[in-house]
């Protein structure tokens, strides 16, 4: 039957219908597209007339900004937006993407009434199919998250699937998820409706106008150069879709926007003899790698193949996007999957195979936010084939970012500043997107890692650790050890093991954690971001006092844990700062803060020749010596007393370790366990590591990885930025009051907001949850994002979790809210409110009882054994 379908296709290739589908209507029919001279100046210039650009223009104008110009190189909605399959799905793995898609759905639903332009919006619902139990678990996790944010959904049986869509073959299904309010829509018409509404609000729209480059002066946008002249402006928004990468590089100060295009295929058929009902649900068969929707009485079906075809690697195609060449051989696996799922298609005539470009990013999430190097330069691009679903919400969040300084939701996982220039080479992007595109429909189990673009940034110890069994994860392009596999383990089986249940590395991490608590372990943490701030006078101290909420005017050698807050009191960074001398400071931040923190510091530090900010991440290898025997190892290597009397907690000192001088030794471990961080000049890294491992043998030393670190820090209730802390989280909401000095004698960013919050109270509170009735061996594991229930009512979600080998329980961190039963509005959360509740954690639809704590469970840690009693033979050779 496949060959019969292909023969029909061959006959239809000469049909006029092949050339007429989805021709975007003239932009002048719905929005005032000007052919007159461009204005000399504007407040905002937006590049791109697809759904992203028109959404940003629409929302900026709704928020009161009027002096806006939108430029499109071709016709409005005639780029990738024109070829969009028109499926609006709210079933996303990411919480912020769920909210963006839900907002988009509501926005598109009312656009016809607002503008009078038909958008083809039809609420059909969607059904996501599961051929395996693991896929069903994944859908159940999504379902539980959708329900708590007000998106109706349910898990249904194969029989119910057949009732909702009678043409589907359901014999191989184990279940499905039904989302009744998902929709289909004409993406081009949505973009034109948004443009029309924006135009009515004063936005000036010019088509057939190309942006050549952005004008920049002293790190600030000053205007744009187009093929029709210059426009002075304060803000520029790059919504150029697949050309956003090229446009970013064309600036006077090049900007890296890491995205790359791939070919994306879907077919269109002639109508059925007896058409399906117009509201027949859209089908997503991720295990079969296909999607199916009604289209003009027939069907539209495409998918995400395992072997995608990247395009335009060499640079920008100057022509307006057209349908790319058909490739039926490439599409054949998807077509076969389609015929298995819908056998009745054998008799249906195929009209056309559409091949259009779609853009993808290195981590499968869209890119939005302000440039780290140019103020006033914003980006919204790289939608990973979800532009229609996310476009309305993404445009709203970016407009809020521009107007108010911050979006209303935490969008760090989408922020342009999560990437560095190192992730923007053409070769890297070409290889990475070939992995990303199939991942859209691949089963996403916890803790999976990308396989392409690896070993981009490594510690000097990488080869040494790799030879000792290190298994690697990647963060901001940096390789970090997850755990170390003993020689007798099957490495291949361990790496290929993917599960929502107890992982195969459980026992390995347990032995690493035990060693951290009873002997000594070494974790390579070289990926940490490291800055030095120095001055000739007091400028460094004065500037840092303004930028950070804790008091940094401490004696030389002391370390301060502190937040770098925004004006709303939220965490832009959570870091440790050591005072090296009276006028120099050493700042340690999370790995993925390298670009963001650098941009923030450069934005607020005075432009003073006496003040120097230097990124020294690459200069130092960082080793974390954790455990009660760390003091013995370091004492023997340095011939210096390292006991608390001589080297108190949160103290920093440059010392000799082995033969190496200038090692910055800090009495902290980021876990609450005893030990030291060693910041080693990279030329000494191998020597110091070898000496530590050699001397440490008699103390039971071994390597450990970040999985052990996570277990240790979560059981001690240590919140990490990017997971538990973000720009919308304040110190008062996460138990960080002790790291805020409101009366330190100098104003700091966020102080007014914290003073106000201290008076009014907090509306959420970070708590620690210990699962009671959870069977580690048999039950699904928590990871992050699980709904939290208080007294049977939704109260928040988890932010991170780990198994505590000390408590022999799973521990989750998460925020508790107090939602009014009458209005649903948030109310003040008090300590009493937390303590009086009975809690459950929802894991894929099953609720597990949990105890909530606002402080670490210290009673479990009071039985510390004396180091002399440790049976060191337990650790030798492991």
From Swiss-Prot:
It is found in: Mitochondrion matrix. GO terms for cellular component: mitochondrial matrix; mitochondrion. It holds the Pfam family DAO. Keywords: Mitochondrion, Transit peptide. PANTHER family: PYRUVATE DEHYDROGENASE PHOSPHATASE REGULATORY SUBUNIT, MITOCHONDRIAL, SARCOSINE DEHYDROGENASE-RELATED. Decreases the sensitivity of PDP1 to magnesium ions, and this inhibition is reversed by the polyamine spermine. This is Pyruvate dehydrogenase phosphatase regulatory subunit, mitochondrial.
């Amino acid at each position: 039957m496949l060959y019969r379908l292909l023969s029909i296709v061959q006959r239809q290739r000469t049909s006029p219908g092949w050339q007429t589908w989805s021709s975007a209507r003239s932009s002048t029919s719905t929005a005032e597209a000007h052919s007159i001279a461009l204005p000399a100046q504007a407040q905002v210039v937006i590049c791109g007339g697809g759904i992203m650009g028109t959404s940003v223009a629409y929302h900026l104008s709704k928020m009161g900004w009027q002096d806006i110009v939108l430029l499109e190189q071709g016709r409005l909605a005639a780029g990738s937006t024109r070829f969009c399959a028109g499926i609006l799905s709210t079933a996303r793995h990411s919480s912020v993407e769920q909210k963006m898609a839900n907002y988009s759905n509501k926005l598109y639903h009312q656009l016809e009434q607002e503008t009078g332009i038909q958008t083809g919006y039809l609420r059909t619902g969607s059904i996501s199919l599961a051929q395996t139990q693991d896929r069903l678990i994944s859908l159940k996790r999504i379902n539980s998250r959708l329900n708590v944010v007000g998106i109706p959904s349910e898990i249904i049986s194969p029989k119910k699937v057949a009732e909702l869509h009678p043409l589907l073959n359901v014999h191989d299904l184990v279940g499905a998820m039904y989302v009744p309010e998902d929709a289909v829509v004409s993406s081009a018409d949505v973009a034109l409706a948004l443009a029309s509404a924006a135009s009515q609000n004063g936005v000036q729209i010019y088509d057939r106008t190309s942006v050549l480059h952005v004008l920049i002066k002293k790190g600030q946008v000053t205007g744009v150069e187009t093929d029709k002249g210059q426009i002075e402006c304060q803000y520029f928004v790059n919504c150029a879709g697949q050309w956003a990468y090229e446009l970013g590089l064309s600036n006077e100060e090049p900007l890296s926007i890491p995205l790359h295009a791939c070919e994306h295929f879907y077919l269109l058929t002639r109508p059925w003899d007896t058409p399906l009902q117009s509201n027949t649900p859209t089908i997503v068969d991720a295990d079969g790698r296909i999607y199916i929707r009604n289209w003009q009485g027939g069907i539209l079906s495409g998918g995400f193949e395992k072997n995608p075809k990247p395009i335009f690697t060499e640079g920008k195609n100057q022509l307006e996007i057209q349908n790319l060449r058909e490739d039926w051989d490439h599409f054949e696996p998807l077509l076969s999957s389609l015929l298995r799922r819908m056998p009745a298609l054998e008799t249906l005539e195929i009209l056309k195979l559409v091949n259009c470009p779609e853009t993808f990013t290195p981590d499968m999430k869209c890119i939005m936010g302000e440039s780290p190097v140019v103020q006033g330069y914003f980006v919204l691009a790289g939608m990973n084939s979800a532009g229609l679903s996310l476009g309305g919400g993404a445009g709203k969040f970016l407009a809020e970012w521009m107007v108010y300084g911050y979006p209303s939701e935490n969008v760090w996982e989408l922020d342009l500043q999560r990437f560095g220039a190192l992730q923007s080479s053409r070769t890297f992007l070409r290889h990475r997107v070939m992995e990303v595109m199939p991942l859209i429909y691949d089963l996403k189990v916890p803790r999976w890692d990308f396989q392409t673009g690896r070993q981009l940034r490594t510690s000097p110890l990488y080869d040494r650790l790799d030879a000792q069994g290190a298994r690697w994860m990647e963060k901001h392009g940096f390789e970090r050890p997850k755990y170390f596999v003993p020689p007798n383990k099957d490495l291949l089986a361990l790496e290929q093991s993917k599960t929502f249940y107890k992982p195969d590395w459980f026992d390995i991490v347990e032995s690493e954690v035990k060693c951290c608590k009873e002997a000594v372990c070494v974790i390579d943490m070289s990926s940490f971001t490291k800055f030095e701030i120095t001055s000739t006078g007091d400028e460094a101290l004065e500037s840092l006092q303004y930028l950070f909420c804790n008091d940094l005017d401490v004696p030389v050698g002391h370390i301060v844990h502190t937040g770098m807050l925004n004006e709303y009191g939220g965490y832009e960074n959570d870091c440790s700062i050591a005072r090296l001398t009276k006028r120099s400071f050493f700042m340690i931040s999370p790995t993925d803060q390298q670009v963001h923190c650098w941009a923030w510091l450069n934005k607020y530090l005075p432009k003073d020749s006496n003040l120097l900010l230097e990124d020294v991440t690459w200069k130092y290898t960082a080793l974390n010596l954790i455990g009660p025997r760390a003091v013995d190892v370091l004492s023997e290597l340095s011939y210096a007393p390292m006991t608390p009397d001589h080297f108190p907690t949160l103290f920093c000192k440059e010392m000799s370790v082995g033969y190496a001088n200038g090692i910055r030794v800090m009495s902290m471990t980021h876990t609450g366990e005893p030990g030291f961080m060693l910041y080693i000049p990279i030329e000494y890294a191998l020597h110091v590591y070898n000496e530590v491992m050699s001397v440490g043998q008699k103390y039971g030393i071994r390597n450990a990885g970040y999985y052990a670190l996570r277990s240790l820090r979560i059981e001690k209730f240590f919140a990490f930025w990017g997971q538990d802390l973000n720009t919308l989280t304040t110190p008062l909401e996460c138990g960080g009051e002790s790291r805020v000095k409101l009366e330190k004698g100098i104003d700091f960013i966020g102080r007014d907001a914290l003073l106000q919050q201290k008076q009014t109270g907090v509306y959420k509170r970070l708590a620690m949850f210990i699962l009671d009735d959870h069977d580690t061996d048999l039950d699904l594991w928590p990871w992050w994002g699980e709904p939290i229930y208080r007294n049977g009512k939704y109260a928040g979600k988890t932010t991170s979790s780990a198994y505590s080998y000390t408590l022999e329980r799973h521990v989750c961190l998460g925020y508790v809210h107090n939602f009014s039963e009458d209005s649903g509005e948030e109310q003040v959360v008090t300590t009493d409110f937390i303590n009086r509740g009975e809690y459950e954690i929802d894991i894929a639809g099953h609720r597990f009882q949990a105890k909530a704590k606002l402080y670490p469970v210290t009673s479990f840690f009071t039985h510390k054994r004396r180091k002399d009693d440790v049976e060191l033979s337990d650790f030798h050779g492991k």
